[in-house]
Design a protein with these regions (language model features):
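N-terminal signal peptide c-region/cleavage motif recognized by signal peptidases
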Residues: 14-17
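Generic cytosolic/nucleocytoplasmic N-terminal low-complexity/intrinsically disordered segments
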Residues: 1-2, 41
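Sec-dependent signal peptide recognition
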Residues: 2-9
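Beta-strand-enriched cores of mature, soluble protein domains
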Residues: 20-153
Length: 153
């Protein structure tokens, strides 16, 4: 079971990803798992991870913080007896240094990336609703990861 949690954590680390939207707003981030829970079903296993992330923007626009803290919740599905995920989702929430908020949601892709979309935002983030990123894991460590995110649109 511990192995399933570790594999699922590492597979989904890039979900610890980003919101934003313009072609220049990419970056990298770190994720540290702060809570993990395994739910066993008859034919599969669900893993829920909650992480504390730091998103570091490559070229933040004027008025944006260079880094943003986020809390992300991942749900990862694995077939019973298998360690590789069959799919998953992530939702990240942010209240930035100036009090603006955003919510990102993402789905795991067959190429081991995560496709993220900003679904709700206020203040300076409001213009990014509908923006998408692709997150990929650069480095995995037990209990966390380092990842990159690039804008799709």
């Amino acid at each position: 079971m511990k192995k399933i949690i570790a594999i699922a954590t590492l597979a989904l680390a890039p979900t610890l990803s980003f919101a934003g939207g313009h072609a220049s707003l990419g970056g990298h981030g770190t994720a540290r798992i702060i809570d993990s829970h395994v739910i066993e079903g008859k034919s599969g296993v669900l893993v829920r991870n909650i992480s504390s992330d730091v998103w570091i923007w490559d070229n933040p626009p004027e008025g944006f913080d260079a880094a943003t803290g986020a809390e992300c919740t991942q749900y990862i599905a694995c077939a019973k007896g298998q360690e590789a995920p069959v799919g998953g989702t992530v939702t990240c929430r942010v209240i930035d240094g100036t009090g603006d908020v955003l919510i990102n949601t993402g789905t795991f892709q067959p190429n081991n990336s995560v496709l993220l979309s900003t679904i709700a935002a206020t203040g300076k983030w409001a213009a990014f609703v509908g923006a998408q990123w692709v997150g990929t894991t650069r480095h995995r460590i037990e209990g966390g990861s380092v990842y990159d995110f690039k804008p799709v649109n």
